[in-house]
Amino acid sequence: MSQLKDQSAAASSRRTFIKQAAAVTAVTGTGSIIKTPVYGQNQAPSTGRVIGANARINVGFVGVGNQGFNTHVRQIKNNDAKHNVQATAACDVFSEYRDRAQEFMGVKSGNVYNDHRKLLERKDIDAVVIATVDHWHAPVAIESMEAGKHVLIEKPMTRYLSEGFDVYDTCKRTKRVMQIGAVFCLEEKWHKAAQLVRDDMIGKLVLGQSSYCRNSPKGEWNYTINPKLTDASVAWKRWLGSTGTRPFNADHFFRWRKYNHYCCGILGDLLAHKIHPLMIASGNPEFPNRVACLGTKEITTDRDVPDNTQVLANFPSGYTLMVVGSTVNQQGLPEMLRGHHGTLYFGGDKVDLKPETPFGDEIDPESFSGLKPSGADFVAEHADWFDVIRNGGETKGNIDLSMRAQVVISLAEMSERMSLTLLFDEKSRKITTGTGQEVQPLNYPA
């Protein structure tokens, strides 16, 4: 009986300690979620206008198609007074998109371009939103930061891994503020989970799981083709960029997410929205050390990329991430973060903590609700970026998180396409098989 009392007292003491630790964290702040070292910090930064806490931020937009216009141009313009910003200039290779952006922004024709380099020459532009086709993310981001501009880059950060590290190194060297356009990074529930993990509320992490599943009977990304797109209305060769030479193709222009030349499909478009948050929730995002991915396309065959995919990523701490994506079945996995002592369940603006049965005497079940922002809050995504530009700190989708997530995405694509499980060394940045054979990352044609 005495031994049972001692165990009960120990469990009660541990429960009290955990709650006290959580309270201290809540009062003092969580600090950076990144604990691992970063590279490229010792080089001189680029110059740019110093933006004070009350200064207006002038924003340029590169890529103003559907995502660029509706998510970024429209939202930033509609909230310009609230955020003290001005939608200043826009760039796109398609004249129809340029004209639409110009009219909505209310700017003169001299403020819209078909070459982003002209926009970057302007000294009055402080920040650039990049919502181009994926293979243009890296060159525009790098040139923007070299020109002293802060950047918001739509997910995925880059098309391929090597250029991802080019963006990463440039951001570290120039000290520009970067935000990834994976909007669910802004959801407070993931940051609450990170706090609970750091406070040892669920023990050592075991597995984080999520999914992004749709069912598109006509085929995902088969967007309407605008008949106004012609050889004369689009800078086709410029749009192709480093992907190689091929004849004008409207299907490729509007439905580019289906093709490996330009995109990795579900991985970059949908699962990026789940990989970033699950890495935040871990409390200390790491580079993966092993990634495996499967994929099939037995239902929608009009594409290169899979319509059904599953990703597993291991991390040095022992944490495993599992994400599933589909465009042919909408039933997803429950979102949860499993620890040795307890599990976190996610839903809407809520996180539920439930102890594992063997640890029920040590951990109380708890529910945390009303965690805002919640959902796809693009206004919050922009506000976070602008706030860090003015006041310093880290965005919720910062460069450290984004680079780690990009490694997962890029290795998952390689794994699926090569039918390999791949290992990653964060210090050397080398990719190998389980037998030690080095594997070169996918890249553009020579």
Put a short name on every predicted segment:
Residues 155:
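Short basic (Lys/Arg) and small-residue
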Residues 2-150, 162-177:
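N-terminal glycine-/serine-/threonine-rich beta1-alpha1-beta2 phosphate-ribose binding loop
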Residues 45, 150, 158-233, 238:
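A contiguous active-site-proximal alpha/beta segment in oxidoreductase catalytic domains
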Residues 94, 211-217, 243, 295-298, ...:
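Glycine-rich beta-alpha junction loops
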Residues 226-245, 352-362:
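Mobile, glycine-enriched helix-loop/loop "lid" segments at the mouths of ligand-binding/catalytic clefts
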Residues 98, 134-136, 152, 165, ...:
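Tryptophan-centric aromatic hotspots in well-structured domains and transmembrane helices
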